[in-house]
């Protein structure tokens, strides 16, 4: 019986040793051949995919209402801050009225210069300056056009009437001259016979002298008429010249006013465009959809300067990126395209899943941390689109901590354990 018990004990011992041997051998084989993920752990933080947008006001002014707060989500184009618009609106209204008057005045002067008697609304003015009194202003310009053209016409008509009067005088003078020349011929005929009679004694000497005196008077009147002809013709020429000069003066005057008005209208349009730009910016709107961050204005009625930074808008993004600092001695093992696993340590570890992604960028040169003065390479990784669904319901904000594990390959447990020893031994054997 004692032999039987001893034999059983030896059998159990051998079985135990076999189990230990097989277990150790299996563990050794697993450690030698089973693949384990090889990688690099990098602490990182969530960053904005794309840059945050600065919100500024180009002109500055007085804040009327602040419509948002830090952390508030806004849509693109949504009002953020409302500026006091009173001065800008008054400036627009004033310039609008002046511009409308300048354009209507320009149209009236152009009609005067062209000699047109009708005046139409300038093209595009109703859209550029939609004023309720635009029609009344156009009618006033029509009345001014008519009155100025009438005044000029009356002035020229008076000059033409003077010319007609001079021409009538000229015609009367021609008739008088004709009569005088007829009288001259008759007197010459009478004198030729009277001189013969007087020489023969048939006619008194004093009667001959009377006829000669009459002829001399007729000749004097003819000479006077000839001089009068020249004066009247000169007066007609001067009157015609005055008409031409007045018309030329009028055109020059209108042309000068027209050029001045055109310049004034262009200047006013530029000023109006600038004033409208200022009025449009009385409401500062979100450039993109996202979250308000870094709000720097807190008081209604406060004054902000031109170009002053008011807040940032952190854009919404369909992608999620993280950025970390990669140790300098590990940069040779990391490159773009490597798969990563990310763990958002700001959330409950038991409920937050690991999400997959890939390395999108490793900086080309090393950088220096301003706080600890340690060199590093910037590493960026992006969450896969398929993995974004795992983060639904979680509010991911820029700056949150993330643990990133970059998978660089596979190796065995024995390689993990003995490679540092082999590397050290290789260095030690190489030393002199």
UniProtKB/Swiss-Prot annotation:
One of its GO terms (cellular component) is plasma membrane. It holds the Pfam family HlyD_3. Residues 37-432 are periplasmic. One of its GO terms (biological process) is secretion. It is a single-pass membrane protein. The chain crosses the membrane at residues 15-36. It is found in: Cell inner membrane. Keywords: Cell inner membrane, Cell membrane, Membrane, Transmembrane, Transmembrane helix, Transport. InterPro entries: MFP, Secretion_HlyD_CS, T1SS_HlyD. Residues 1-14 are cytoplasmic. Belongs to the membrane fusion protein (MFP) (TC 8.A.1) family. Involved in the secretion of alkaline protease. This is Alkaline protease secretion protein AprE. It comes from Pseudomonas aeruginosa (strain ATCC 15692 / DSM 22644 / CIP 104116 / JCM 14847 / LMG 12228 / 1C / PRS 101 / PAO1).
């Amino acid at each position: 019986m004692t032999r039987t018990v001893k034999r059983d004990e030896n059998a159990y011992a051998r079985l135990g040793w076999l189990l230990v041997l097989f277990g150790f051998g299996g563990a050794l084989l697993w450690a030698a051949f089973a693949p384990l993920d090889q990688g690099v752990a990098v602490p990182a933080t969530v960053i904005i995919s794309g840059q945050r947008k600065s919100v500024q006001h180009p002109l500055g002014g007085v804040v009327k209402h602040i419509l948002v707060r830090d952390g508030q989500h806004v849509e693109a184009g949504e009002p953020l801050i409302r500026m006091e618009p009173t001065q800008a609106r008054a400036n627009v209204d004033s310039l609008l009225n002046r511009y409308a008057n300048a354009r209507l005045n320009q149209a009236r002067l152009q009609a005067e210069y062209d000699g047109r008697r009708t005046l139409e609304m300038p093209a595009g003015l109703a859209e550029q300056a939609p004023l309720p009194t635009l029609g009344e202003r156009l009618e006033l310009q029509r009345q001014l056009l008519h009155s100025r053209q009438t005044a000029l016409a009356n002035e020229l008509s008076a000059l033409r009437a003077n010319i007609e009067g001079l021409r009538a005088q000229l015609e009367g003078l021609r008739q008088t001259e004709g009569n005088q020349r007829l009288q001259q011929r008759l007197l010459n005929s009478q004198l030729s016979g009277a001189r013969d009679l007087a020489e023969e004694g048939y006619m008194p000497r004093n009667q001959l002298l009377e006829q000669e005196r009459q002829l001399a008077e007729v000749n004097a009147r003819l000479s006077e008429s000839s001089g009068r002809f020249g004066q009247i013709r000169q007066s007609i020429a001067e009157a015609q010249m005055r008409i031409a000069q007045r018309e030329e003066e009028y055109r020059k005057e209108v042309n000068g006013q027209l050029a001045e008005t055109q310049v004034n209208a262009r200047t006013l349009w530029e000023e109006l465009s600038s004033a409208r730009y200022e009025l449009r910016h009385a409401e500062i709107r979100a450039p993109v959809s996202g979250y308000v961050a870094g709000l720097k204005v807190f008081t209604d009625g406060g004054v902000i300067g031109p170009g002053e930074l008011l807040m940032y808008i952190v854009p919404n993004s369909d992608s999620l990126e993280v950025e970390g600092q990669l140790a300098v001695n590990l940069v040779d093992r990391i490159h773009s395209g490597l798969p990563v696993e990310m763990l958002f340590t700001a959330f409950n570890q038991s409920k937050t899943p690991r999400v997959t992604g890939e390395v999108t960028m490793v900086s080309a040169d090393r950088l220096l941390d301003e706080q600890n003065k340690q060199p590093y390479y910037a590493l960026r990784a992006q969450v896969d689109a398929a993995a974004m669904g795992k983060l639904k319901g979680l509010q991911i904000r820029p700056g949150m901590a993330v643990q990133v594990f970059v998978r660089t390959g596979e190796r065995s447990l024995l390689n993990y354990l003995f490679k540092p020893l082999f590397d050290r031994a290789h260095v030690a054997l190489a030393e002199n």
